[in-house]
Swiss-Prot record:
Activity regulation description: Activated by magnesium and inorganic phosphate. Inhibited by ADP and GDP.
GO biological process: 5-phosphoribose 1-diphosphate biosynthetic process; hypoxanthine biosynthetic process; nervous system development; purine nucleobase metabolic process; purine nucleotide biosynthetic process; pyrimidine nucleotide biosynthetic process; ribonucleoside monophosphate biosynthetic process; urate biosynthetic process
Protein name (database record): Ribose-phosphate pyrophosphokinase 1
Gene encoding the protein: PRPS1
E.C. number(s) listed in UniProt: 2.7.6.1
InterPro entries to which the protein is assigned, alphabetical: PRib_PP_synth_CS, Pribosyltran_N, PRibTrfase_dom, PRTase-like, Rib-P_diPkinase, Rib-P_diPkinase_bac
Region described as Binding of phosphoribosylpyrophosphate: spans on this chain: 212-227
Required cofactor names: Mg(2+)
Annotated consequence of substituting H231D: In a colorectal cancer sample; somatic mutation
Taxonomic source organism: Homo sapiens
The protein's role, per its UniProt record: Catalyzes the synthesis of phosphoribosylpyrophosphate (PRPP) that is essential for nucleotide synthesis.
Amino acid sequence: MPNIKIFSGSSHQDLSQKIADRLGLELGKVVTKKFSNQETCVEIGESVRGEDVYIVQSGCGEINDNLMELLIMINACKIASASRVTAVIPCFPYARQDKKDKSRAPISAKLVANMLSVAGADHIITMDLHASQIQGFFDIPVDNLYAEPAVLKWIRENISEWRNCTIVSPDAGGAKRVTSIADRLNVDFALIHKERKKANEVDRMVLVGDVKDRVAILVDDMADTCGTICHAADKLLSAGATRVYAILTHGIFSGPAISRINNACFEAVVVTNTIPQEDKMKHCSKIQVIDISMILAEAIRRTHNGESVSYLFSHVPL
């Protein structure tokens, strides 16, 4: 493809390489380093004048450093006369801070949107935003892609009894997500209502729906410390589920998450590779990964060629 350049930030170079390989491109030359005072320095190592530039950087790992690196890369390309700069952010940072839920709370997702725009981003490509209204925080186009087609494909190919399963949301907020998957599989859905007293601590769970003698598949957009999904798995087993799976778009897995998964009753915890999982998989055999590089690569190809990306909302590209 002419007049296109793809650069990778340091957060997830493996995913960036897979995207570039699928597009038949080489990653652009970029050098990132830190000065002795920990300031981030980025050097774009090739001309981007008149080019359609895509910068891949996920909101994971050292999130603040990686966000700053992305902003600097966007700005460096913009002032070097790139014709368009698109930030490809598989896991959007600060997405959970999307509303003012208590006095004096910041809306940090809006701040990040402002920063990306001011840095010079012309377009954002992301996946499974924690709150879809974050798209409205931008005055530039945002393509919020979905892992759902890849999740459906994984369920059909890897769970032999998928016709006898129930899709379960671990909270009321995910009801729309699980009903969509359940409808497309033509199976039932359930949800778990949770009463939470402190952040990351679940007090009481109430199952709404039937999982008795069925395979229960927990579906959520992200899991951090995994307290919620591990409690939910216990609840589902006690309600008569034969087996329990968890399928998540963004596997953050911080703090005690890995030990909780190892001690939980999951057959498998399936995540996409919006966040690197290699190190975590070494410590937890239950973690399996769905590759979504083909979805992001096809979104980039269609964007570059001026084509619609809505096909990707219901299909997995080959």
